[in-house]
Amino acid sequence: EPEITSEQILDKISTFDIIIVRSRTTITKEMIDKADNCKIIARVGVGLDNVDQEAAKAKNIRVINAVEGAMNAVAELVLGLMLSLARQTARGDRAIRNGEWLKKELKGTELRGKYLGIIGLGNIGKRLGRLARALNMNIIGYDGVPIEEEFSREVGLMKADLDTLLQSSDYVSIHVPLLDSTHHLLDAQKMSTMKKTAKIINTSRGGVVDEDALYNAIKNGTLGGAALDVFEKEPAIGTKLAELDNVILTPHIGAQTKEAQSLAANVIAEKIIQILRGVI
């Protein structure tokens, strides 16, 4: 039932054995407390912040997601956003639509040889690292958990703490969940340590970046630009970041490809089958 409301879920949830959701539906503790027959809650996507995982754990309900489905789609979006920031293609498009020809003004830069800092080297972060390495970018990585040595060797990863990564990178791409520990991970103080030409790309969760601090840093010229696919409040209609020429905004489309949607559905179906068979 794709259009089911929260009230309808509360009325019916006691009869569900398996709950499958995308990003629109939030599964709360109140719902889970009534889910007496539920064995699995499956998120067809990456983030699990719309599922109360602690409540599910307390009732021995398995919570699964399909990060494999979005891995390539999100990484490709980040790469496209970096290219657009580097060459100012979004600004050029807007200018032509407004009757302006900014050929001389839009002098870009190349990604080749630039330093890409990746915060969070899970499946998506690693996929991005491989794509960026193919463009001869230098990859700096930070994660709160150990980074796979095989991947590090493959892309020539330079491991660093967060402060060093921010100080050294020309582009910073964020791939972490939104937790208390990652809320405003990039705030005004962190941004002040970055290169004035550096650019931030966030396709993870909006609250990871302090949008007010980001706006001020870019407007004041202490940061080079940003591309955001996620926002602290969505839909982000009316965000003041839209005032800035060197900011690109997209409406949370990281996993919105035909291939990713199909793959995520297949991944979830296979995981559910394996759980029911006792394989995983």
Task: State the predicted function of each range.
Residues 1-64, 167, 187-189, 193:
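An N-terminal-biased, well-structured beta-alpha scaffold segment characteristic
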Residues 1-2, 44-45, 60-72, 162-163, ...:
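Short beta->alpha connector loops at strand-helix junctions that form conserved
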Residues 3, 24, 46, 170, ...:
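Short glycine-/small-residue-rich Rossmann-like dinucleotide-binding loops
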Residues 17-20, 38-40, 171, 199, ...:
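Short, Asp-centered acidic motifs that coordinate Mg2+ and/or phosphate
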Residues 26, 47-50, 69-70, 100, ...:
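Residue-level detector of alpha-helix initiation sites
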Residues 59, 63-64, 149, 183, ...:
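Rossmann-like dinucleotide-binding domain for NAD(H)/NADP(H)
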Residues 59-61, 66-115, 130, 134, ...:
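Phosphate-binding beta-alpha-beta segment of Rossmann-like dinucleotide-binding domains, i.e.
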Residues 104-196:
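Rossmann-like dinucleotide/phosphate-binding beta-alpha-beta segment
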